[in-house]
Amino acid sequence: MKPTDLNSFNTLSNLVGKGTTLVVQSTRMDFETNTYISELWKRSNGQWKSFKTGNNNFSNPKFGDKENTVFYIKTNRSVQDKSRSKKTLSTIHMQAGRSIDTIFEVEGGISNYSLSKDGKSMYVITSEWSKEFKNIEDKNSEPMYYENLPFRFDTRGIIYNKRAHVYKVNIRTKKFTKIIDGDTKDIISIESLVEGGKGLVLSFDQYNSKGTMLEEKIGAIESSKIKEIYSKGSMGNLFYYEDELHAVGMRKRFDWPTNTTVLKISNTGNVSYKYRSFDRNIVKAEVNEDILYFLYEDSGKTLLRDGTNNVDLINSDVTIKDFAFNNEQTFVIANSFSNPDEIYELNNGQLTKISKANESFTKKVKTWDCEYERIDTGKSEIDTWGIFVGKDK
């Protein structure tokens, strides 16, 4: 493989579906501009078409109430061009048919966003420069400052200069209010936010009282304040299932090494295991039509499971990166050692490829099928994927 072949290697993510339509994010390297290009593709009536591309990056698509309404984040692309603005602007757009409307814009990054239950508002999680840095013109050239010497042990690297905030945005009027100020509450990052029976609930990171490490907490937003629900674990991917708050992660952060799993969180802050006997890492969970689906790791693969009925939806030598639902159909982003990212329709455990995202790459680069082998060392068993050669392979 030549290094320039990577120009045609596409990484797929953020697959969403509604009605008969799919939208996916595709990211690839660009050696000419020394940056990454992120685009959106849309599948309607069985055909894929470029949805958003150009001089900016487009990411994190979400459907509105109607099938023809799609929200997405637009970010100015980082390139080695001194004539371009040094400010990083992130914007949420709403596209209904051919009409494009700007909903929200901020200097910094938009980590995530979600629509309110009534569809009238939007909750936006941002990662912005802390107040001490906001007046510095060229922030990328500013030297590093360490607030805490053991910053390498907080699992986040150098995070001295950003704080996370939450905005509530009226989609029709575009007016917004900052309901969580990360500067005043010293919130380093917000992993997840969900609206449900407890109102708005979020998982977030703050330094502990000694400033030696980050603590991951879950709290409910009440009048711009955060009422702490739980602070002993390491959790994200908040969601409601059967009218109860759930999360994916560990009940106690120092239980590692152990499996990340689905946890149920009561109104009083008690945390219990949803699947106590399931001994695999669960990495993502989502509820669709009252059924809980999750991705879990097993022997070097990532598979999709119906957690409500305790049924594996696929048992192949593939890694499922993401999944989405479209009417009564299930679609996944899957890859293997010999097949880079593609989108497949999943039906009765069988995968049918419906995309050609990496067709150009696989024509240029020869790939190999790897074999799975569990090797017994006498003291432990090791899951191995490889190309076994020689007469004793």
Map each language-model feature to its residues:
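Predominantly five- to eight-bladed beta-propeller fold
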Residues: 39, 127-169, 215-217, 352-357
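Blade-terminus and WD-like Trp-Asp/Gly-His loop motifs, strongest in beta-propeller folds
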Residues: 15-21, 60-69, 113-121, 192-199, ...
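Multi-bladed beta-propeller domains
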Residues: 1-12, 41-59, 85, 91-111, ...
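Non-catalytic accessory segments flanking enzyme active sites
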Residues: 13-14, 125, 132, 159-160, ...
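Beta-strand-rich domains and repeat architectures in extracellular enzymes and scaffolds
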Residues: 4-38, 189-191
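Hydrophobic or amphipathic alpha-helical targeting/insertion segments
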Residues: 70-132
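Beta-strand C-termini and the immediately following turn/loop, strongest in propeller blades
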Residues: 23-32, 71-81, 123-129, 156-160, ...
